[in-house]
Amino acid sequence: MGDEDKRITYEDSEPSTGMNYTPSMHQEAQEETVMKLKGIDANEPTEGSILLKSSEKKLQETPTEANHVQRLRQMLACPPHGLLDRVITNVTIIVLLWAVVWSITGSECLPGGNLFGIIILFYCAIIGGKLLGLIKLPTLPPLPSLLGMLLAGFLIRNIPVINDNVQIKHKWSSSLRSIALSIILVRAGLGLDSKALKKLKGVCVRLSMGPCIVEACTSALLAHYLLGLPWQWGFILGFVLGAVSPAVVVPSMLLLQGGGYGVEKGVPTLLMAAGSFDDILAITGFNTCLGIAFSTGSTVFNVLRGVLEVVIGVATGSVLGFFIQYFPSRDQDKLVCKRTFLVLGLSVLAVFSSVHFGFPGSGGLCTLVMAFLAGMGWTSEKAEVEKIIAVAWDIFQPLLFGLIGAEVSIASLRPETVGLCVATVGIAVLIRILTTFLMVCFAGFNLKEKIFISFAWLPKATVQAAIGSVALDTARSHGEKQLEDYGMDVLTVAFLSILITAPIGSLLIGLLGPRLLQKVEHQNKDEEVQGETSVQV
């Protein structure tokens, strides 16, 4: 009987919480009961539990300490690896590049020399882009690195000690920017998707043409009455501002598309496709107005000359485009390299020779048409060419934005001019947002999607940097002070538009996208949901 009194019984019924007892839970309950019978508190640590916890703690700490020791050994290893190896390699490449150029050119690569200025600007622009890329905000897309490149060039120009030693001749600066413009135009032409244009049709045309033309006209009106520019220069400024920046819009759209936002209605696809056509329209309008502005004679003659430049550009681009569709033929060796060399070489030749022959507006249009037709003929094979051209763009992008920033001098800017330029940009952007909202009405989008598209169509960067200085370079070639002042006003507005709209546009896309766009729900891990474009024409 005494043994029966000491016996401990347990009920096999489930607890009232609905949870099932597992064998481990049953064992823990037995141990707790035994400790209570012995007069030991269950919460009081025993000697065994203390030893067990200390051993577990040592096991947890040992791998961490081992990782730190291993990392330290890797950093101090001989030969070095990891971060230290990358730093030494990059510094060696930087010094070697300067040393090779110095051994060939001598004083040109010393402080105050032209090549020295280009190399330092190139290095600083890359560093500026990398530093800005380190600024990462949660749930937001990264700030565009081109903004850091722009600010790097601006600081080089406006810090007296650096500016005295970093000097770049206008001829070199203009030529490098023109080469960068050629690369941008080739990428835009090859990037045009005829299938996307057929699918999106009406709304794509409205979105690419409406806001660009309305903003260009608004900017021309403001530039004429606020900045005192002639009408021709006003429209030059208008088409500089009229383009949206693929460098800001496309990465942000890819992030949203990867998260499933707006895919069902095809919002990212629409914006990426319409962006290329928007840029082409702005560049074509700019080149036409540029040819008219630097023509002599009556207004009718200037308009006809502008039309003639468009015809020459389209005709020449068509001939060259069909030529490089078939030459080189597909059976040749190193086909991709030959195609890349031809399309880049012909585009640079078109941009420079058009200025030489007195038709500056035809070169850019010729390049666009040529690249578009070549891409249509190459079909899927153009992707390999685009990869090589993307590498060329990675080299010239720091030069382009760094040189644009270096053209703006604080000493030469008047406060009232800066204020008027900011007002011009602000009013033009506001009109663009309203116009974009109207253009996507009756296209199958709800109110939130219309608001998002309106703000996503805001950023400016690449095209403004590419063509913003062309008018100034052309004016310098004519040697007229008044025209140079007009060109400087255009460049200042382009600089401010990049500085203001690129970061704001990127942040707005990142903030508004997840809140305003519908997200596609993935029911199964193996199920891929592809966004079908359901846009009413």
Curated annotation (Swiss-Prot):
Q: How is its activity regulated?
A: Allosterically inhibited by the N-terminal domain. Inhibited by phloretin.
Q: Which GO terms describe its cellular component?
A: apical plasma membrane; basolateral plasma membrane; mitochondrial inner membrane; mitochondrial membrane; mitochondrion; plasma membrane; recycling endosome; recycling endosome membrane
Question: Molecular function terms in GO for this entry?
Answer: identical protein binding; lithium:proton antiporter activity; sodium:proton antiporter activity
Instruction: State what changing R432 to K/H does.
Output: Loss of ion transport activity
Region listing for Disordered, in residue ranges: 1-28
In this chain, Na(+) is annotated as bound at: V244, G275, D278, D279
Q: Keywords, A to Z?
A: Antiport, Cell membrane, Cell projection, Cilium, Cytoplasmic vesicle, Endosome, Flagellum, Hydrogen ion transport, Ion transport, Membrane, Mitochondrion, Phosphoprotein, Sodium, Sodium transport, Synapse, Transmembrane, Transmembrane helix, Transport
Pfam families from the UniProt entry: Na_H_Exchanger
- Residue ranges with Polar residues bias: 15-27
Q: Where is the composition biased (Basic and acidic residues)?
A: 1-10
Q: In which tissues is it expressed?
A: Widely expressed. High levels detected in the distal tubules of the kidney nephron. Detected in red blood cells (at protein level).
Residue ranges crossing the lipid bilayer per the database entry: 87-104, 114-133, 145-161, 172-189, 201-227, 234-242, 271-290, 301-324, 340-357, 362-373, 391-411, 418-440, 462-473, 487-509
Q: What is the effect of changing K57E?
A: Decreases Na(+) Li(+)/H(+) antiporter activity
For side Cytoplasmic, which residue ranges?
1-86, 134-144, 190-200, 243-270, 325-339, 374-390, 441-461, 510-537
Locate the Phosphoserine modifications and list their residues: S49
Outcome reported for the amino acid change (mutating K58E): Decreases Na(+) Li(+)/H(+) antiporter activity
Protein's job: Electroneutral Na(+) Li(+)/H(+) antiporter that extrudes Na(+) or Li(+) in exchange for external protons across the membrane. Uses the proton gradient/membrane potential to extrude sodium. Contributes to the regulation of intracellular pH and sodium homeostasis. Also able to mediate Na(+)/Li(+) antiporter activity in kidney. May play a physiological role in renal tubular function and blood pressure homeostasis. Plays an important role for insulin secretion and clathrin-mediated endocytosis in beta-cells. Involved in sperm motility and fertility.
Entry-linked PANTHER family: PTHR31102, SODIUM_HYDROGEN EXCHANGER 9B2
> Quaternary structure per UniProt?
Homodimer. Dimerization is essential for SLC9B2 activity. Lipids seem to play a role in the stabilization of the dimerization subdomain.
Its recorded name reads Sodium/hydrogen exchanger 9B2
Q: Which gene encodes it?
A: SLC9B2
